[in-house]
Amino acid sequence: RLLAASRSTRLNLEMACTLAMTEFALKLKPHSVCLVPESREEITTEGGLDVVKHRDKVARVTDAMNAAGIKTSLFIDPDPEQIEMSARLTAPWVELHTGAYANAYYAAGRAAEFVRLVAGARLAHVAGLVVNAGHGINYINITEVRTIPHLHELNIGHSIISRALSGGIDEAVRTMKQLMNP
């Protein structure tokens, strides 16, 4: 709450679709929320929120956020079924889970995972969704990730904070921004 009160930038809250988190977000009033899996049962094979299986719960939370003027993103796998359901719900954004791509970066499956992300971004864009991406993005794979079409925002945390431990947060952010926008 202290961070929310003193912030000078946007605050994005990653949260599960629970009553407690919904109430917390409605009190906190962040700029945006990203709905993520709450437990192992809600995780699809690659790790995104299964909005098809949990559409009623996701719809309730999304509707509550919309009514409060809080933008909502759904953290999903780049799977057509998940994207199509996301478009039917009232969240204006999706965050495509890039973890499978990041995990396959040095493996044979990298190209196929990248193709999935590109196809997912295109499908989401055509469906009228704002496209974000995140999970496992780092200083090496960003050069390819940044070429995914229709990306509005990338959510990168771990690699920036890890680099900041040795060179400071200013250098870590500056370097990532240079790699994102050469």
Question: What kind of feature is each model-predicted range?
Answer:
Residues R1-R10, M85-E95, E144-H158:
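Short, electropositive alpha-helical surface patch
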Residues L19-L28, D79-L89, A133, I137-L151:
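Catalytic cores of alpha/beta
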Residues G47, Y106-R110, R163-P182:
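C-terminal helical cap(s) of enzyme catalytic domains, especially alpha/beta-barrels
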